[in-house]
Amino acid sequence: MELEDIRRDYSLGGLRRADLPQAPIELFELWLKQAVEAKLTDPTAMTVATVDKKGQPFQRIVLLKHFDSTGFVFYTNLASRKAQHLEDNSKISLHFPWHPLERQVHITGTAEKLTALENMKYFTSRPKESQIAAWASKQSSRLTARAALEGKYLELKQQFSKGEIPVPKFWGGFRVKIDSIEFWQGGDSRLHDRFLYSKDQDKWVIDRLAP
């Protein structure tokens, strides 16, 4: 399979320092809004990278569920591989690849667990099928067959057929507190625009990076 000639031009526009707000969350909100308006598939999907005790990195796609000036929020099984990694090392990075808009956003930071109240508020807002699935799946554990998972799901569906479904103790969210956030916009002749916001106490320092 020949890969050398697979490429394309980037021509949707550049990013200039004059376009940048002082707070990166404002630009992220604008870009995410534009990704939604452009009807991109899964615009809130982000790559979440963590490392294990040996320093081996792992990545997976997770959906962003909330963001504001305090950080970026996602939810998971607290016994999952990513959650176990974060117990040992709270350093984390997030990546949003908005290819059709020729944009990327890369975030580094530290992950902190959400409160039980925050977990409950989001869990109860989910469709019932998703709530049951959270109970059924021991995320990242080995399965003998898919039938075992489906059987457990059906068993729990019957068990929780009436009334509210409680929040599993092994399920919850993380808030990624931002250390840095980079905005990448494709440019002509591979002269891409990259701007890095780095946290310096209570203010943001903005640097242009070479493509």
Swiss-Prot record:
Pfam family, one: PNPOx_N
Leading EC class: oxidoreductase
SUPFAM superfamilies: FMN-binding split barrel (SSF50475)
Gene Ontology MF terms: FMN binding; pyridoxamine phosphate oxidase activity
Known catalytic reactions: pyridoxamine 5'-phosphate + O2 + H2O = pyridoxal 5'-phosphate + H2O2 + NH4(+); pyridoxine 5'-phosphate + O2 = pyridoxal 5'-phosphate + H2O2
Required cofactor(s): FMN
Gene3D superfamilies found in the cross-reference section: Electron Transport, Fmn-binding Protein, Chain A
Positions of substrate binding: R7, R8, D9, Y10, K65, Y122, R126, S130, R190, L191, H192
Family that this chain belongs to: Belongs to the pyridoxamine 5'-phosphate oxidase family.
Protein name: Pyridoxine/pyridoxamine 5'-phosphate oxidase
Source species of the chain: Aliivibrio salmonicida (strain LFI1238)
Gene transcribed to yield this protein: pdxH
